[in-house]
Amino acid sequence: MKFFNREKEIEEILHIIESEPQRINFIFGSINSGKTALINEIINNRLNKDKYVVFYFDLREIFISKYDDFIEVLFEEYEEPFIDKVKRLFLSLIKDYPDVIKSYALLNITGVVDSIPIPKNTLNELLKKRNVKNVFRYITSVLIKIKREGKQPIIIIDELQKIGDLKLNGFLIYELFNYFVSLTKHKHLCHVFCLSSDSLFIERVYNEAMLEGRCKYILVDDFDRETALKFMDFLAKENNINLTNEDKELIYNYVGGKPIDIIYVINEMKYKKLEDILTSMLKEETQKLKYFLENVKEEDEELYKKVVDALKIFKDSYEIEDIKIPKKLREFLVKKNILFLNPIEGTLKPQSFLVWNAIKRIL
């Protein structure tokens, strides 16, 4: 399927990439709002592969519980050519020697890659010493080599919050943030983009004193009504489906501007009635919310009452000011993916129109 819209966000991100690295860039939004699709469109179709080298680390489907997992995500080992081994051994005997080794693996990095090449023996050393500073030192050396070849390195980490609680002499995430600040604000060496649908993680970052003035936040939200209707027309044409204005309004009233939900509806329309599709989707979301509330009630009657009172606020409004719901309660509802928090704007809303409609139906 062709990529649709997001020209405003694309223009903003390309402007960042074409400028000198200055800040850590956080791309955030509700679940399935199109963050990954956006960044993939940019790195695969909008960048000159001869000018940029993108290291794209997708943590979405990777279980990371220890240091070794983190290292394996970052690096891909290769056998170091014999001549490089000899050079490194010889130069290691010379004090303050310049970095002149140019590995074939490093010189041939181009376009988008999902790991950083590393000699097998170097990787073994990193795993053995378990010192994150050595890891960052090696990455920096790779980035410098790329820069010397006239290319701009870019690091992208999708779902960064997955290492948020990983400890290695303190929380690894803080070591990583310090390193990213060094790469961007201090050395101006590499662009850094972090994607996340975890709005509590973004709130934690936003309130982190060490990152003040060192980050930029880019919201990739669900489509607004006008864009959502155009997206439906786009998909209908792609799939040779006839959509009336009434059909489009009905779809929007059920699923709003959530791209993945609109795509699902249009695909299902190839062999199902629109009303049946939407009724089924809302029924499923309503059942999930009903069982969630049932579980809360069984575990804590008092919490259940507070949750119900909080969700009732959304019967009349899709979006509210965040402080209308007490902090611990809103964090609970955000963690359970019922609500989405935008800490930059200070707003709360259901994760999707489907969730919103389920809230209104149950309460």
UniProtKB/Swiss-Prot annotation:
Molecular-function annotations in GO: ATP binding
Query: Into which family does the record put it?
Result: Belongs to the archaeal ATPase family.
Does Transcription appear among the keywords? no
Q: Does the keyword Magnesium apply?
A: no
Q: Which InterPro entries does this UniProt record tie to the protein?
A: ATPase_dom, MJ1010-like_2nd, P-loop_NTPase, WH-like_DNA-bd_sf
Q: Which organism is it from?
A: Methanocaldococcus jannaschii (strain ATCC 43067 / DSM 2661 / JAL-1 / JCM 10045 / NBRC 100440)
Question: Which terms are listed as keywords in the entry?
Answer: ATP-binding, Nucleotide-binding
Residues reported in the UniProt entry to bind ATP: 29-36
Judging by the UniProt lineage, the source's domain of life is Archaea
Q: Name one Pfam family in it.
A: ATPase_2
Q: What protein name is recorded for this chain?
A: Uncharacterized ATP-binding protein MJ0632
